[in-house]
């Protein structure tokens, strides 16, 4: 996993240039202003950046003169990510089935995430049902069918333009009838400032609540890593409508910033659970803060 992270985070690492920044320290001391600029430009956000720098300053001040601030920074970032309860935890299971509701804006990667989660669960020996509740986007149902076939999961769908709630209801019954372990619901993408669409999403969530008594509930917001700090607005808006239990950060291999992953959970209390590193089924992985930070900063793995 570390080698894959290191490879896929190359663009982010190059853009941030943490090692190059700290390599100047022996001649000029640490440029806190430059570090602040790097973190903010990398979409970490002002609040999180200030906390990172304050914490790092404190650690540097009590360390010896030979301390490597890059290594200390990796520890600071890792510890901050781990402070958010649930960070990097897999989908939860009990004796009853688990229902996973995927929500997010258009183009965030919900459909492929649904299939990749199903594929991962299949490797653990769990049976899943995929609910094609995106009944509005042209080709959405067929896309999920194709991805579901690749993942080895059954897809429950209705004709295009049908009622998403009815799809979810039928998928719940299919999950129970077939003795499956998990139902993953793919919903239509919606802008977080469109009240009518958000109300529809709340209705779908309510159908799950009403018909899945005793089930484990997960609600994941799927965020495109390229969205930057706009992702925080999405977390806040969707979280008002659906009780979010985690974030899935997709397309992390396509961004040259990526700092939103450091601030999303911390500022709003929703943990990052999974991260997408590519197009393959195997490229959706659990988010491991330690390995992520090591790959982001580079050359610090052995001593963190």
What feature does the model see in each segment?
Residues 78, 82-304:
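P-loop/Walker A NTP-binding module and the surrounding RecA-like catalytic core of P-loop NTPases
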Residues 1-102, 117-119, 123-130, 150, ...:
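Non-catalytic terminal/linker segments enriched in charged/polar, low-complexity residues
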């Amino acid at each position: 996993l570390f080698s894959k992270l290191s490879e896929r985070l190359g663009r982010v690492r190059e853009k941030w240039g943490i090692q190059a920044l700290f390599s100047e320290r022996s001649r000029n001391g640490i440029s806190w202003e430059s570090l602040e600029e790097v973190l903010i430009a990398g979409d970490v956000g002002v609040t999180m950046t200030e906390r990172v720098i304050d914490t790092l300053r404190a650690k540097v001040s009590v360390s010896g003169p030979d301390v490597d601030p890059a290594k200390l920074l990796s520890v600071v970032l890792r510890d901050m990510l781990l402070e958010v309860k649930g960070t990097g935890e897999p989908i939860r299971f009990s004796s009853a089935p688990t229902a996973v509701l995927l929500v997010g804006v258009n183009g965030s990667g919900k459909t492929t995430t649904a299939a990749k989660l199903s594929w991962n669960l299949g490797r653990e020996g769990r049976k899943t049902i995929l609910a094609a509740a995106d009944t509005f986007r042209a080709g959405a149902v067929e896309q999920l069918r194709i991805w579901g076939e690749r993942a080895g999961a059954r897809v429950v769908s209705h004709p295009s333009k049908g009622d998403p709630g009815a799809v979810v209801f039928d998928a719940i019954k299919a999950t129970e009838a077939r003795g499956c372990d998990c139902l993953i619901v793919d919903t239509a993408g919606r802008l977080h400032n469109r009240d009518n669409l958000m109300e529809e999403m709340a209705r779908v969530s309510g159908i799950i609540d009403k018909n899945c008594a005793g089930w484990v509930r997960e609600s994941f917001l799927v965020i495109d890593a390229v969205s930057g700090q706009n992702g925080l607005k999405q977390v806040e808006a969707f979280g008002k409508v659906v009780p979010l239990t985690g974030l899935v950060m997709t397309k992390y291999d396509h961004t040259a910033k990526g700092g939103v992953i450091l601030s999303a959970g911390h500022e709003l209390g929703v943990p990052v659970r999974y991260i997408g590193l590519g197009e393959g089924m195997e490229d959706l992985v659990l988010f491991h803060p330690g390995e992520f930070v090591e790959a982001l900063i580079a050359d610090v793995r052995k001593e963190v």
